[in-house]
Amino acid sequence: MSEYMLRCRGEEYDLKVKLHQEMNFNMIRNWIGSVTDDEFYQACDKYGIMVWDDFWLNSNSNLPDDVFAFNMNAVEKIKRLRNHACIAVWCGDNEGYPLPPLNKWLEEDVNVYDGGDRAYHANSHSDGLSGSGPWMNSHPNWYFTKAPYGYGANITRGWGLRTEIGTAVFTTFESFKKFI
């Protein structure tokens, strides 16, 4: 999820999610569960944008101080969001695997509290996904023809969903004027 989505509040999500739809995006990744606003999920439902929703783990091989509190929060998140049609994937960890016992718990939580009909993926960039990077803008054709700079080697049919990249972010107009 790009920085400009993280700065939204309330009705601003409607326009920004609509722009994603108009750009033919079909999924937004809620990186590490950064956005919690109901308006975000409502806008995604409205415009038919799927959400890849991460839990709050970030490629760090440490457990939260209280794994039981973490799990209770995960259950509450699932219950709160499960009725949104936009939720497509629940993801356990950004660029890593949730350490025991969390991975097992999160997978069970998704099955029990979300009816078991949505995907749970433990790691955001492995197990069949296209992987990390590149962390730069690329020629638009590359997103459908080749993986630049060795990222996603052996991809012959384009990238599909790249979990580690997003829409390009442009600075504010005021900052751009100062730069020029």
Residue ranges and their predicted role:
Residues M1-M27, W31-T36:
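An acidic-aromatic substrate-binding cleft motif
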Residues M27-I180:
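Substrate-binding/catalytic cleft of secreted carbohydrate-active enzymes
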